Amino acid sequence: SLAVAVGNAHGAYVQTPNLDFDRIASLRSALPIPLVLHGCSDIPPEQLQESVRLGMSKFNIATEYFRACYHGVVQHGDPAEKNGDMFRLMMETSENAIDFVRGKMRLLNPNKFTF
């Protein structure tokens, strides 16, 4: 596989990114290997869907995932009060993490996954 730069970047965006769909299509037609898009957090859903349509194979969405997990912890009180209890932290983040992953799976492969 090949990770490509087409308007994406790691971490949080200062402004809404605009993916270069012409470049994605051009790379897809020129290369016989799967294309990977890093830095997909906060890229608008319609841009991710268009990337799928153009042949993008894999999407890395860590920042947005971590944010969803953090919100799960915060919903259950002050994270500082957890005293480093990782089991408790993981249990508190699991519902948010699962919901986030399911949502992205539905977005990127709407005909393949049902939950």
Would you name each region that the model predicts?
Residues 21-26, 52-60:
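Short, electropositive alpha-helical surface patch
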Residues 1-22:
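Glycine/Thr-rich beta-alpha phosphate-binding loop at enzyme active sites
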Residues 74-115:
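Extended, intrinsically disordered, low-complexity segments
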Residues 2-4, 35-39, 57-61:
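Hydrophobic faces of well-ordered beta-strands that scaffold small-molecule active sites
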Residues 16-37:
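Alpha-helix-loop-beta-strand connector modules within alpha/beta enzyme cores
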Residues 40-55:
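Catalytic cores of alpha/beta
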Residues 6-10, 54-70:
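Glycine-rich phosphate-binding active-site loops on the catalytic face of alpha/beta enzymes
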